[in-house]
From Swiss-Prot:
Highest taxon in the source lineage: Eukaryota
Catalysed reaction, written as an equation: (1S,2S)-OPC-8 + NADP(+) = (9S,13S,15Z)-12-oxophyto-10,15-dienoate + NADPH + H(+)
Residues reported in the UniProt entry to bind FMN: P35, M36, T37, Q110, R241, G324, G345, R346
Involved pathway(s): Lipid metabolism; oxylipin biosynthesis
Function noted in UniProt: Involved in the biosynthesis of jasmonate (JA) and perhaps in biosynthesis or metabolism of other oxylipin signaling moleclules. In vitro, reduces cis(+)-12-oxophytodienoic acid (cis(+)-OPDA) and cis(-)-OPDA to cis(+)-OPC-8:0 and cis(-)-OPC-8:0, respectively. May be required for the spatial and temporal regulation of JA levels during dehiscence of anthers, promoting the stomium degeneration program. Involved in carbohydrate transport underlying normal lodicule function during anthesis.
Keywords from the UniProt entry: Fatty acid biosynthesis, Fatty acid metabolism, Flavoprotein, FMN, Lipid biosynthesis, Lipid metabolism, NADP, Oxidoreductase, Oxylipin biosynthesis, Peroxisome
Disrupted gene: phenotype observed: Open glumes after anthesis associated with a delayed cell degradation process of the lodicules. Reduced grain filling.
Natural source organism: Oryza sativa subsp. japonica
GO molecular function: 12-oxophytodienoate reductase activity; FMN binding
Name of this protein: 12-oxophytodienoate reductase 7
Lineage: Eukaryota, Viridiplantae, Streptophyta, Embryophyta, Tracheophyta
Principal localisation: other
A single GO cellular-component term on record: peroxisome
Family stated for the protein in its record: Belongs to the NADH:flavin oxidoreductase/NADH oxidase family.
Length: 394
């Protein structure tokens, strides 16, 4: 059994483990479960395995963010990802949310649409995926197919400007469904090369209409989605995630700081009208959505730090960071004021009691990458041991 070190009491008082007041919710600590695709919602409907998985990772007054949950039938780009666009899915999520609330957790639903990061096999009637562009994702990247193999990303269909309001409405309705399911709020996934990021980044967005070209135009879709969701459920239940300096799925921008600042300034203006958002969630440049750590994708570590601190210093509200954080980096980020909250992904996969392990500075279970995206409801999902339990045999 792992034993806590002598400085256990001092670590319990560290800022990472101190309470935090969000606009609507009070947290008991600053360690957040990051949104992570796990491919266990068979047929797009969350089942008992998801309820157990999230409940295992719940602490009293802790914030959890669900895996990416698609807002329409055209939204998926992985097998067995959950949706929240119909009544069956909404009702199924209620049981998962109830399991989290029963343990005192605060639960946000991440609203997701992958855009061009999909394949005809995931699309209604085998249609081409939709995007801001008709450029496909390069052969550098591969898509996970339903049979577990990997394939090439196909050429997407460029959305007409007249089609975009329908997608905005899908986000709005999904947010309403999330609140009906009992979620405490939602996070708009505007990061990691998915559909909103496909409008934000000038390396993808080659449009010449009101949704392309200038920074203002490239930010338009995100702002329309955010305003629609805020009008439906209230600003203090709405969060936004961005990753201006990450080129995952070819989502490259020529000036990440300028892009990040453009988003932040517009969110600040929105907050002046609608009230404070729940938080802004920014992924550190060293992270990619496939779990790789790549420091310096867009420059030196100093430049990456400058980006995060610039956004932190400009955004008027709760600032959450993520991307390859260790316990020590999380302690430092909160203590230095670089972030209010820190979200953890892979470490939470293999350590359902991560918050307690961090408090005690206890040892951590190692995650098994090959089980990240498998449909097994137990192995690599709910069978990682808690402190004091025998080690997993995986």
């Amino acid at each position: 059994m792992d034993r806590p070190p002598p400085d256990q009491q001092r670590q319990k008082q560290a800022p990472l483990f101190s309470p935090y007041q969000m606009p609507r919710f009070r947290l008991n600590h600053r360690v957040v479960l990051a949104p992570m695709t796990r491919c266990r919602a068979i047929g797009g409907v969350p089942g008992p395995a998801l309820a157990e998985y999230y409940a295992q990772r719940t602490t009293q007054g802790g914030l959890l963010i669900s895996e990416g949950t698609v807002v329409s039938p055209a939204g998926p780009g992985f097998p067995h990802v959950p949706g929240i666009y119909n009544q069956e899915q909404t009702d199924a999520w209620k049981k998962v949310v109830d399991a989290v609330h029963a343990k005192g957790g605060i639960f946000f639903c991440q609203l997701w649409h992958v855009g061009r990061a999909s394949h005809q096999v995931y699309q209604p009637n085998g249609a081409a995926p939709i995007s801001s562009t008709d450029k496909p994702i390069s052969a550098r990247w591969r898509i996970l197919m339903p049979d577990g193999s990997y394939g090439k990303y196909p050429k997407p269909r460029r959305l007409a400007a007249s089609e975009i309001p329908e997608i905005v409405e899908q986000y709005r309705q999904a947010a309403i469904n999330a609140i009906e399911a009992g979620f405490d709020g939602i996070e708009i996934h505007g990061a990691h090369g998915y559909i909103i990021d496909q409008f934000l980044k000038d390396g993808i967005n080659d449009r010449t209409d009101e949704y392309g070209g200038s920074l203002s135009n490239r930010c338009r879709f995100l702002l329309e989605v955010t305003r629609a969701v805020v009008s439906a459920i209230g600003a203090d239940r709405v969060a936004v995630r961005i990753s201006p300096a990450i080129d995952h799925l070819d989502a490259y921008d020529s000036d990440p700081i300028k892009l990040g600042m453009a988003v932040v300034e517009r969110l600040n203006a929105l907050q002046q009208q609608s009230g404070r958002l729940a938080y802004l969630h920014v992924t550190q440049p060293r992270y990619t959505a496939y779990g790789q750590t790549e420091s310096g994708q867009h420059g030196s570590a100093e430049e990456e730090s400058r980006l995060m601190r610039t956004l932190r210093g400009t955004y008027q509200g709760t600032f959450m960071c993520s991307g390859g954080y260790t316990r020590e980096l999380g302690l430092e980020a909160v203590e230095s004021g670089d972030a209010d909250l820190v979200s953890y992904g892979r470490l939470f996969i293999s350590n359902p009691d991560l918050v307690e392990r961090f408090r005690l500075n206890a040892g951590l279970n190692k995650y098994v990458r090959k089980t990240f995206y498998t449909p097994d409801p137990v192995v690599g999902y709910t069978d990682y041991p808690f402190l004091g339990q025998p080690k997993s045999r995986m």
